[in-house]
Design a protein with these regions (language model features):
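Aromatic-rich transmembrane-lumenal/periplasmic boundary elements in polytopic membrane proteins
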Residues: 102, 179-249
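Membrane-interface helix-loop-helix modules in multi-pass inner-membrane proteins
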Residues: 17-87, 104
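Conserved small/polar residues in nucleotide/adenosyl-binding loops
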Residues: 266-273
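Membrane-interface helix-loop junction between the first two transmembrane segments
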Residues: 1-6, 35-36, 161
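Short aromatic-rich membrane-water interface segments that cap or initiate transmembrane helices
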Residues: 42-53, 121-140, 268
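Membrane-interface interhelical connector segments
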Residues: 252-265
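Functional transmembrane-helix hotspots
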Residues: 30, 34-38, 99-116, 192-209
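Internal alpha-helical transmembrane segments
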Residues: 67-75, 80-86, 97-105, 128, ...
Length: 274
């Protein structure tokens, strides 16, 4: 009884967030053509099918069963309604799968060849399950679950404070807290593995994110600062000593490659190509 009462409240919240997701998703689809036409012109043979898979397998699944979940409780059996609810959740997760597959491929492209300036698929398995995809998908799914847990816990705590729906709200509050307690250590582990994967495949990006200009051992973690590209330094930087090396290499004196070395490397490679 309590769970049903909680469901009737939270399904309304889900319906609102789903509507916002649809609106923002449609806008994003148009942005691929309006903001990045050059990118789509060259990678459309890969990006287009991945976006199409998301619509055909995920969005249609969500849209088909969302109506039953929202409005069919009194019109279908409890089992059918339960299955519809789980299928909507599965469709949402499947949507994240395809979107993050494309996003990850943009970071760590694989399974393609370039002909006449166009990207063509050689292996869809390699494209979808590219080097950063498992880490990014796990990290994002855990982040979504953690965000939901804190949202649920926060709203329930507010409702309890206002004296609304005591027993049911307390039960859901506990579930939110327990979920967060379970997911937090998993997210820390997933985030660490994702960071190590990024360091392996995109070390220049890591150096840029951390504001590490020169290759160094015992690199500090910059909390705040103002990057100066001409001087190649971060002015007024507030750092935690050795923290960047500890996070990225798991050693206090681990070596982290700096942006200056990448500039020299890429400049040298470009000169060799010319």
């Amino acid at each position: 009884m309590y769970w049903e009462h909680a469901y009737n409240f939270w399904v309304k919240v889900y319906a609102l967030t789903f509507a916002l997701g649809v609106v923002s998703g449609i806008t994003m689809s148009f942005q691929f053509g309006t903001n990045w036409p050059g990118f789509m012109e060259r990678t459309g043979n890969i990006a287009g099918p991945l976006l199409g898979y998301e619509v055909l397998t995920a969005f249609f699944l969500e849209a088909s069963f969302l109506g039953i979940m929202l409005f069919g409780k009194q019109r279908v059996s409890n089992r059918t309604h339960l299955i519809s609810t789980f299928l909507v959740a599965f469709g949402t997760s499947l949507s994240a799968f395809w979107i993050l597959a494309l996003n990850s491929w943009m970071h760590t492209p694989a399974g393609y060849e370039i002909r006449d300036g166009q990207f063509f698929a050689e292996s869809w398995a390699a494209i979808i399950f590219n080097p950063s995809f498992p880490y990014r998908l796990t990290h994002m799914m855990l982040a979504s679950l953690l965000t939901s847990a804190f949202l649920v816990a926060g709203v329930c705590a507010y409702r309890i404070q206002k004296g609304v729906d005591g027993p049911a709200t307390k039960m859901v509050l506990k579930s939110g807290i327990y979920t967060a307690a379970l997911v937090i250590p998993l997210q820390i582990l997933a985030g660490d593995l994702h960071g190590l994967n990024t360091l392996e495949h995109q070390p220049a990006k890591v150096a840029a994110m951390e504001g590490i200009w020169e290759t160094q051992k015992g690199a500090g973690f910059t909390i705040v600062g103002i990057p100066d590209e001409e001087a190649r330094e971060t002015r007024f930087a507030v750092k935690i000593p050795n923290a960047a090396s500890l996070i990225l290499t798991h050693e206090l004196d681990g070596e982290v490659k700096g942006l200056h070395d990448f500039c020299l490397l890429y400049t040298s490679d470009a000169a060799d190509e010319v």
